[in-house]
Every structure is written in C-alpha cells, then in structure tokens.
C-alpha cells in the first residue's frame, strides 16, 4: 500500500499500474508462496502422526527439489520433445513426465512423513511435481521478460539458489492446502 502511494506523491504515475502489478506478483511468488513453509510448522498435532510439521516440511522441500533434479536428469537423458521452447528451451516432455513419475514414486516411499493415506500420498506427490514444474516455468518466463539469464551459478547447469527455490513458490501453497484439506 505504501509503495504505490510513494509513486503518486512523487508525481511519477506513468506506468503505475504495471509497476503495481509487478510488485504484487513479486510479493505473491516470494512472500505468499514461500510463507506456506512456516504454516506447515504451525499445523496442530494429529493423533498417530508423530512427524508433525517438521515431517511435512521435509517431505515438501525434499520432493520439490528431487522433482527439479529428476526433471533435469530425465530431460538430459531422454529429452527430445520441447515442452515450452519460447519460455524454457531446455524443458522437455520426457523430463517433465520422468520427473512426475520419479517424484510420485519417491513420495510414496516418504509418505510416513505425512498423515496421508497411500493413495493420497501418491496424488499429492504427483500434484507437487506438476506444481513444481509450473513454478519453475513461470519464474523462467518472468526472468526472460526481465532479461535475466540465470540467478547465479552455484550449481553448474542448474542455476543459483533462487533457481533452486522457484518451484517452492508454487509447491508450498499447493501442498499446505492439500494436506490441510485432506488430513485436517
């Protein structure tokens, strides 16, 4: 609320709508999305579920990161068909599907970290993989629009720290609300 007012008070209203929209999206992706990590820790204890919020947080972060890695590996190994060449030219259908399948299988074996039944763990794991891909390509589109190539090079061929957490901006709220709806 303060930032648009500051522009108005300066008399700098040219492009204010675009500036406000950009600010809102940045806040949505960074603050709103990532804040759901903390919400997981505040969920009440469930009878018979000893991992609590820490287990949920570990499940979410691990699956989100393993999904990114698996999509990268499967794309490198088998990738032939580009999925979004104008937005993220290295993403392939083979990488996407390999990542979804791998993440779902790994999620099934890590289901003990959640209060979910096996069918729900499978569903949630698959949806996390899809949400992670969505977050990754949306951030890629924003970076492309703003002329930003990579957010760093701490992991060769995989970008910097922000590139490691871009998927979490989508997976965190999806996971929180699915778990809350299904288990609480």
Give the location of each predicted region:
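Membrane-embedded alpha-helical bundles of polytopic integral membrane proteins
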Residues: 1-127
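Acidic (Asp/Glu-rich) catalytic motifs at the cytosolic membrane interface
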Residues: 64-80, 93, 97, 130-172
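Hydrophobic transmembrane alpha-helices of multi-pass small-molecule transporters
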Residues: 103-104, 164, 171, 180
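A general structural signal for short secondary-structure boundary/capping elements
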Residues: 107-108, 174-176
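Juxtamembrane boundary at the C-terminal end of a transmembrane helix
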Residues: 177-184
